[in-house]
Design a protein with these regions (language model features):
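N-terminal metal-binding scaffold of metallo-dependent hydrolase/deaminase domains
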Residues: 1-44
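Histidine/acidic-residue-rich catalytic or RNA/ligand-binding cores of hydrolases
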Residues: 228-240, 268-273, 290-299, 316-331, ...
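C-terminal cap of metal-dependent C-N hydrolases
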Residues: 371-428
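Active-site gating loops and adjacent loop-to-helix segments of metal-dependent hydrolytic enzymes
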Residues: 74-106, 150-168, 228-253, 275-278, ...
């Protein structure tokens, strides 16, 4: 693949900008720039050369969704104005339990298509207790970089029987998925160990999940300190604050990504930094569920890696990295008037720090040998303006762009989305299929509710 004439924003430093520069990628990796890119493109024997005209456009490392629930895409626009725990109990857990493989597939394909069309190249997906194969199948068909797996939930006191799996069953399913999917699709698919949160898992399961992740070298993906009621419940049950408890059971570490950390405090900042654990900041979800505002400036000052995620379409209603970037940039200005989060830092959180949170191997950014996972933006589409006012384009991206500015999304050196193709290569399910899946899901939810009334 040859991307010609773009402005390359590598995001290694604020001045990591190369204007009017060609980029050549082969076998999923960036190989060369400028004249050398043209030379390699002419000499390639890897088949037909794909050319992208990026003149007047910006090329940057791909956006990463560091916390996502693809199983919830069809649950969008359900009950509103709820806080976390009642929202889970009333809508989300019944909805997840009502999935079959077919509706899970529709939900995943729709969410992945929505993500690719917004420039997202990689996702860390929480999945659900069952039908995880449908998620991996959708990811494999889409060409997105996918880290996910089944969700572990076994506590009979806090989880519904329809969405519960005994510890042995849940861990065995994670092992099966690892054998079936890990490293498949040219390495684009990875399995994670995913205890949902301390509220829904027994202590024994949490400890065994940590052991399994260590044994297999897998990413750990969980929720923590999202909501005050959740934090109080965890401390009442375990005798420890939420994040300290995760450390006590062995779940913190450099391959762990914790979603939210809204109510993390000073001891947590130091502990997360010491363990090398990443945090996925999900501002729109935290606002919509009245959870609060993540202390991102304090986390970053402590040395904690902070990435961005949209959470699920059921709790923010859009899988849109641009909205998360905007909110991530603006919210600190309300909470901490004396400081701000620069647009450059927000873009790093949405890209390079997201890749780090997913433990993606190899060099990051736009350097030779880095993954050819790229987002190409058109600054002159819609209401954004070219970067005439500033030598740096970062503010324009964080504050005034949206998915309409995404000209193309490249994953592993393959174009997976072009703006001219709103169907995302046929990945997006037709409207009739989406409506049918929602109706089937809702009918099963209503039947289950009537049976327990």
């Amino acid at each position: 693949m040859l991307i010609e004439g773009g402005t390359l924003l590598g995001l290694a430093a604020r001045d990591d900008i190369q204007r009017g520069t060609d980029l050549y990628a082969e076998d999923g990796r960036i190989r060369a720039f400028g004249g050398e890119a043209q030379r390699l493109a002419r000499a390639t024997e890897k088949g037909p050369l794909v050319r992208l005209d990026a003149r007047g456009k910006w090329v940057l490392p791909g956006f990463v969704q560091a916390h996502l629930h693809l199983c919830q895409t069809l649950l969008r626009n359900g009950p509103e104005d709820l806080e976390l725990l009642p929202w889970l109990q009333i809508h989300v857990w019944p909805g997840e339990a009502a999935h079959d493989a077919d509706t899970m597939s529709v939900s995943a394909r729709l969410g992945i298509a929505e993500s690719l069309s917004a420039g997202v190249t990689a996702v860390l997906d929480m999945g659900s207790v069952r039908h995880s194969d449908a998620l991996f199948e959708a990811a494999a068909a889409s060409g997105i970089r996918y880290v996910g797996g089944n969700v572990l939930m076994d506590d009979p006191e806090t989880t519904p029987p329809t969405l519960r799996a005994a510890a042995e069953e849940g861990l065995a399913e994670t092992k099966r998925l690892h054998g079936e999917w890990h490293g498949r699709a040219n390495g684009l698919l990875s399995v994670a160990v995913q205890p949902r949160f301390a509220v829904s898992c027994t202590d024994a399961l949490m400890r065994r999940a940590a052991e399994l992740a260590r044994d297999l070298g897998l990413v750990v993906h969980t929720h923590a300190s999202e909501n005050r009621a959740e934090c109080a419940l965890v401390e009442r049950r375990t005798g420890l604050p939420n994040i300290a408890y995760l450390d006590a059971v062995g779940l913190l570490g450099p391959r762990t990504c914790i979603a939210h950390a809204v109510h993390a405090g000073e001891p947590d900042f130091a502990l997360l930094a010491e363990r090398g654990t990443a945090v996925a900041h999900c501002p729109s979800s935290n606002l919509k569920l009245a959870s609060g505002v993540c202390p991102v400036p304090e986390l970053r000052r402590a040395g904690v890696r902070v990435a961005l995620g949209s959470d699920g379409a059921a709790c923010n209603n859009l899988l849109d990295p641009f909205r998360e970037m905007l909110l991530a940039a603006l919210l600190p200005r309300a909470r901490y008037p004396a400081e701000h989060l620069p647009a450059f830092d927000v873009l790093r959180m949405a890209t390079r720090e997201g890749a780090s949170a997913l433990a993606l191997e190899g060099p990051a950014g736009l350097t030779a040998g880095a993954r050819a996972d790229l987002t190409i933006l058109d600054p002159e589409t819609g209401w954004s303006l070219p970067d005439d006012w500033s030598a740096e384009p970062y503010g324009s991206i964080a504050y005034s762009m949206g998915r309409g500015n995404v000209a193309a999304t490249v994953v592993d050196g393959v174009v997976r989305y072009r703006r001219e193709d709103p169907s995302v290569g046929g990945l997006k399910p037709p409207a009739d299929e989406i409506r049918g899946a929602v109706r089937a899901l809702r009918a099963r939810m209503e039947k289950a509710s009537a049976a327990t009334a």
